[in-house]
């Protein structure tokens, strides 16, 4: 007997398990809006060294993130990019809320080299470059995001 797709309890548990894993990898901490989380992950490099800077992000997510890119620019400058023409997002072409920076910015890419269950033991290498970037933008949270920004970056889709 072959179980029917999505009606079998086993298939349902597998599907829910996969969704849970996927969701946890892309989840933001509840206390932040998507724009605030974007700023923490991609603008606010609290230290010039990836290992120290990633500790902030990893503490919120309670795991060592495999890689991350910090744009060495201001949140206001990235918000300005949201005003550039919309384009399909390279990582998901069904979404049309991405915007190309139009100018290169300095950035630091952090790559996990020493994973650990203990967040403070995770180690990263870093690479610096000047690159264009593509961000996804959405309407801001009218209560929790700065009122001067009606549209805000919510996802760093790609660096080029």
From Swiss-Prot:
Record-linked Gene3D superfamilies: Ribonuclease A-like domain
Chief location bin: other
BP GO annotations: chemotaxis; defense response to virus; innate immune response in mucosa
Cystine pairings recorded for this chain: 50-110, 64-122, 82-137, 89-98
Catalytic reaction annotation: an [RNA] containing cytidine + H2O = an [RNA]-3'-cytidine-3'-phosphate + a 5'-hydroxy-ribonucleotide-3'-[RNA]; an [RNA] containing uridine + H2O = an [RNA]-3'-uridine-3'-phosphate + a 5'-hydroxy-ribonucleotide-3'-[RNA]
Entry keyword set: Disulfide bond, Endonuclease, Glycoprotein, Hydrolase, Lyase, Lysosome, Nitration, Nuclease, Signal
One Gene Ontology term of the molecular function aspect: nucleic acid binding
Glycan attachment points: 34, 44, 92, 111, 138
Annotated GO CC locations: extracellular space; lysosome
InterPro entries tied to this protein: RNaseA (IPR001427), RNaseA-like_dom_sf (IPR036816), RNaseA_AS (IPR023411), RNaseA_domain (IPR023412)
EC number: 4.6.1.18
Residues where substrate binds: 65-69
SMART domains in the record: RNAse_Pc (SM00092)
Function of the protein: This is a non-secretory ribonuclease. It is a pyrimidine specific nuclease with a slight preference for U. Cytotoxin and helminthotoxin. Possesses a wide variety of biological activities.
Family as reported in the entry's similarity comment: Belongs to the pancreatic ribonuclease family.
Subunit structure as annotated in this protein's UniProt entry: Interacts with and forms a tight 1:1 complex with RNH1. Dimerization of two such complexes may occur.
Name this polypeptide is given: Non-secretory ribonuclease
Biological classification of the source: Eukaryota, Metazoa, Chordata, Craniata, Vertebrata
Gene this protein is translated from: RNASE2
